[in-house]
Amino acid sequence: MSKSESRMAAAIKQTAPGTALRHALDMIIAGHLGALICIGDTDAVIAAGDDGFKLDISFTANRLFELCKMDGAVVVDKDITQILRANYHLNPSPSLPTSETGMRHRTAARMSLLTQATIISVSERRQVITVYVDGKGYELRNVSELMSRVNQLLVSLQNTRGQLDRALLRLTTLELDNYVTVGDVAQVLYLFEVLLTVADQLDRIILELGREGRSVQMQREEFVAGMDEEYTLLIRDYARDSSEEAASTTREAFRETANMQLRNPKRVAELLGFEGYGEDSVLTPLGLRTLSNVSVVRRGMADKIVDEYGSLQQLMDDIEHNPDRLDDLGVDNPGILADSLYRMWGKHA
């Protein structure tokens, strides 16, 4: 997350339902008022305006609501504990770029470019609350709108997780059969990205919901828990460079690629470092993901096993005839490991 994105996330959190600031904003909307509220970087904000009057009074939702009945901006300290100015006329340079059309929103966007303040604009006509940080605006939604979207995303998350679980089971069988194609891997990677995209969308709503989002967060975790590590291991299994550092870079490349492009096996192969590979090209997995799902393989042990054997198939070829080799690596109960892998395969050791 960039610095600007972090600042926007913090600003949205300040306006979440249940906060005094959000209560004031809801009253402003209910009163069919417009408003311009500047939070933080108060020296720079005050330097960019004039007139109005000095207050230095403690912040309450009712006070902010009453002060917004006047035309000018209200200036609040960064911790939202003090109201410093009211009816303050802001004069940011008109040369500061903005695509906003309304006077109040243009001023808000320019003030957020000129200063490090969070600027909140409430449209009197449209009855919309917009938060501005670094020239970018984020339109807040009410709780009913947010919860409607939450329900849609949770259904999508549940369905995608179900598809992903089935695809991973199939992939494990193919890995143990030693016949995995680029197309097989591309399907699973695509589902991982869809799952994480939906989870990211849900995270933004959880942030906007504030305390109201706690139960949503718990439901999100039910569907996403453990998937982050499994995704990284899957990439390491199939990427040309299997290091953790390279996997992080590859994940970022997948994240920046449109999900629909990830349905193209050739494009997925390119991102994994295999130029010219097609849908039916065969890939050999290292086995990190599969081994990590076996209870007797302690954390970090999968890497040692892969370093020793080179691939999952080499391990499968050797495990039945030479279990002592695993014992030498420090694997507890090599027989249980062998039995677990064969059960995944649907066969007996």
Annotate each PLM feature.
Residues D228-A349:
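Long, highly charged, low-complexity intrinsically disordered interaction regions
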Residues M1-K266:
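Divalent-cation
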